Amino acid sequence: MQIDKIQIEAGWKEALKEEFLSENFARVKENFLRAKAAGEVYPPNALIFNAFNLTPFNAVKVVILGQDPYHGAGQAMGLSFSVPRGVKIPPSLANIYKEIRDDLGIAEPNSGDLSYWAKQGVLLLNATLSVSAGQANSHSGFGWQEFTSAAIRKLSERAQNVVFMLWGNPAKAKIPLIDANKHLVLTAAHPSPLARGAFFGCRHFSKANLYLAEHGKAPIDWDLNNAV
């Protein structure tokens, strides 16, 4: 990974230019290349920054923070909770769909591809952007956390009226990075069936759209059945 070869949207590249040149990112690259040499890494290189490329910096309306990419073959696509069309919908995403159904009356889609949301301004960001095959959280110590924290901090500083959906304790740990005076921070338990606490009934999707409308922004169409 070299900065001149990293394909990332221009707004994000400018916002994160200091981070890309930092000692931390040098450590990320070193750890990443070592992991690649040792075995299979997900997602494919071209999709590592997919969240930033599908949702330009100046277009972000909502942030949904995940932990790390899916570690099964063909699952990870660089968007938190999302899997490519045709791949079995993972349990956490199935629960997200159930909450949207209960919150907004939207029928559960048969695809796990969330690109439709990303293209409307939903930044689907994992705190860690890579993983070794079959080893959940295997890259959590690579320095990605500091990189994605910088992205959240820059959004908080430069953007206005963004909705941050933080599910589970690792996501909630990012709260200090966000200026709650000019953004909406929504918290709940993680949607995983294994998580403790309440995710169902959080109504984050309707709350997000209400907040966006109150601040003169077009709401998100959460209905993935409308995706072409």
Explain the meaning of each model-derived region:
Residues 1-10:
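Generic N-terminal segment detector
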Residues 6, 14, 18-166, 170-173, ...:
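A polyanion-binding, active-site-adjacent surface
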